[in-house]
């Protein structure tokens, strides 16, 4: 059952680039819709569960920082979809996130404690990084300058922060969920309105609430799985989203493979899947 919970974020995160690409708005529209959608999901879960608030102000603030950091990471992905394409952004983003979250989980939280677990974990990381490298470069065959990669490189730290904070605070996952979503709502909507004051008038802004709702569901399920199987395992399983998003970029958003053969892409995705399965079995 916990594996099913852990795989839901991968499905939601994988589908979202396709939805965002089909809506075809701007980064401001996407951030606005994401913030509203996440806030709506948080409110629904909160009303239905009616949890008693027992967390301290410090814990509440840390959870908000976690959500705000995630919004920064997602902004980098939205920008990179246009600069690099979905099918190139997602494999690179996966590898970047993996390195950071793995180091955090192992060094800060003592995960993969035994020698065998460390060997299997290292093997899983190698498979996923190799798979991401093989799968990348599938956008249109044109070379990209380093500046096109900067938004993704600079904002990935947001995902690292988001993934580790739930492990720092020993409270019920539902207690963290609302403040996390509030952090996303404030940063995402605030950034969108700051850069485009009339963003709320755009049709694409409200269409992007659907991806935002799916992100909210994924975030809730991620918190549950991270507390059960570890932040590293939960996050790596979530990176199966790269399989869904890369294929959707190629076949539904019509991004081209350029000189890289489809065999290389398929092999890379297989490596990623094998790495995620290996991690789940540690």
Swiss-Prot record:
- Keywords, comma-separated and alphabetical: Cell membrane, Membrane, Sugar transport, Transmembrane, Transmembrane helix, Transport
**A GO CC annotation given for this chain:** plasma membrane
Coiled-coil regions listed? none
Q: Which domain of life is it from?
A: Bacteria
SUPFAM superfamilies in the record: Multidrug resistance efflux transporter EmrE (SSF103481)
Alphabetically, the GO molecular function entries are: carbohydrate transmembrane transporter activity
The protein depicted here goes by the name Putative sugar uptake protein lp_2594
Organism annotation? Lactiplantibacillus plantarum (strain ATCC BAA-793 / NCIMB 8826 / WCFS1) (Lactobacillus plantarum)
């Amino acid at each position: 059952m916990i594996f099913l919970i852990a795989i839901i974020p991968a499905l939601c995160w994988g589908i979202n680039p396709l939805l965002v690409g089909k809506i075809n708005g701007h980064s401001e529209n996407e951030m606005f819709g994401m913030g509203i959608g996440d806030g709506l999901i948080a409110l629904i879960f909160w009303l239905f569960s009616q949890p008693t608030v027992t967390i301290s102000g410090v814990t509440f603030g840390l959870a908000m920082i976690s959500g705000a950091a995630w919004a920064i990471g997602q902004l980098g992905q939205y920008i990179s979809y246009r600069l690099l394409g979905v099918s190139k952004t997602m494999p690179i983003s996966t590898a970047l996130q993996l390195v950071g979250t793995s180091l955090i989980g192992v060094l800060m939280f003592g995960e993969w404690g035994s020698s065998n677990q460390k060997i299997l974990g290292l093997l899983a990381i190698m498979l996923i990084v190799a798979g991401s490298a093989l799968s990348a470069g599938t956008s249109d065959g044109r070379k990209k300058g380093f500046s096109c990669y900067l938004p993704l490189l600079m904002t990935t730290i947001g995902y690292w922060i988001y993934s580790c904070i739930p492990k720092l605070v020993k409270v019920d996952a539902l207690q963290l969920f609302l403040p996390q979503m509030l952090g996303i709502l404030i940063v995402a909507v605030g950034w969108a309105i700051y850069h485009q004051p009339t963003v709320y008038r755009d049709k694409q802004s409200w269409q992007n609430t659907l991806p935002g709702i799916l992100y909210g569901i994924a975030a809730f399920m991620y918190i549950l799985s991270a507390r059960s199987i570890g932040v590293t395992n939960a996050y790596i399983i979530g990176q199966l989203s790269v399989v869904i998003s890369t294929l959707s970029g190629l076949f539904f958003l019509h991004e081209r493979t350029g000189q890289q053969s489809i065999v290389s892409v398929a092999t890379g995705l297989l490596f990623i899947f094998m790495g995620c399965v290996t991690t789940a079995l540690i």
